[in-house]
Amino acid sequence: MAFRIASSPFTHNRQTTRQIMIQVMLACLPGLMALTTFFGSGIIIQLVIACVTALVAEGVVLTLRRQPLASRLGDGSALLTALLLALSLPPLGPWWMMVLATAFAIVIAKQLYGGLGHNPFNPAMVGYVVLLISFPVQMTSWSPQQSLLLHPVSLTDSMALIFTGVTPDGLTLTQLRATVDGITQATPLDGFKTGLRTGAMTAFHHRWDWQASAGWTWANIGFLLGGLYLIWRRVISWHIPLSLLAAMLIGAGLGHWLAPVVSAPPLLHLFSGATMLGAFFIATDPVTAAATVRGRVIFGALTGLLVWLIRTWGGYPDGVAFAVLLANICVPLIDHYTQPRAYGHR
């Protein structure tokens, strides 16, 4: 009998990288369906643009690096990055913004560092932040919910707005938004920030009706369900999502208790913006998050605290992307001080 000699590691995980990526993308479906239902088919168009750009950009870089195309493109990591960007960017934003964000995420934030497993920062969030800093007006121009528009945006209208900037009837996104009053056209976090600047607090919380915020609430519920599925399937651990949400809620609760005029209530933080998407799908990236159990708890808590701080006092209404990237910077330090001590060593 022949015995094969192999080196460590000897542990075995039945799930391949491709299988993990597919499960994460499937878990995003409830949130994607909610966003599409409330904000229109523009998200699907942006998703197609992002996927094509990600595959082309990754293929070009892999060819230049003389890496195998089939196995690298087939692992699903590029498509997951594209999906996260499509879920994060405004659904009716210009097509070139999605192309720029996706190409930057794949080429600069991922492949420049050596590809999957070597990037220190979450590629999707790097692409998002590049656009947010470079084009803040376009990045904060989310369309209102379909139910609030006098002229609901069809698939044809969405394609025209994304590729030409106007609908077949000659309406721009700004004109479509103008048909909705100033409260309902903003996201919940946008509305809160605007109210702080204009002195319209604290009555904002009572005037914000369910109809205006239903899309964001259901989207977050969808991502929460998808995240619980990933925990059940043991694709991700519970440490980062739970510590992130707990730290954010503790900060928001204390802030709202001490200064309700300048701090949003905890439930607004929990079910607005990219809270659940960030907690279960972005912060849990195994490449850029902490490696140890204690480290994951610290990493998640740090991210959640930063989300609350940026949302409350920062210049942008949602701080998930910046919080994740800032926490990514701290990962080497967290891993250094949370590594388990080897037996026999002090």
UniProtKB/Swiss-Prot annotation:
It comes from the Bacteria. It is a multi-pass membrane protein. One of its GO terms (biological process) is electron transport chain. HAMAP family: RsxD_RnfD. Coiled coil: none annotated. The chain crosses the membrane at residues 20-40, 42-62, 69-91, 120-140, 212-232, 242-262, 264-284, 290-310, 314-334. It is found in: Cell inner membrane. Keywords: Cell inner membrane, Cell membrane, Electron transport, Flavoprotein, FMN, Membrane, Phosphoprotein, Translocase, Transmembrane, Transmembrane helix, Transport. Belongs to the NqrB/RnfD family. InterPro entries: NqrB/RnfD, RnfD_bac. Its cofactor is FMN. This is Ion-translocating oxidoreductase complex subunit D. Its main location: membrane. One of its GO terms (cellular component) is plasma membrane. The complex is composed of six subunits: RnfA, RnfB, RnfC, RnfD, RnfE and RnfG. Its EC number is 7.-.-.-. The keyword Protein transport does not apply. The keyword Electron transport applies. The modification FMN phosphoryl threonine is found at residue 187.
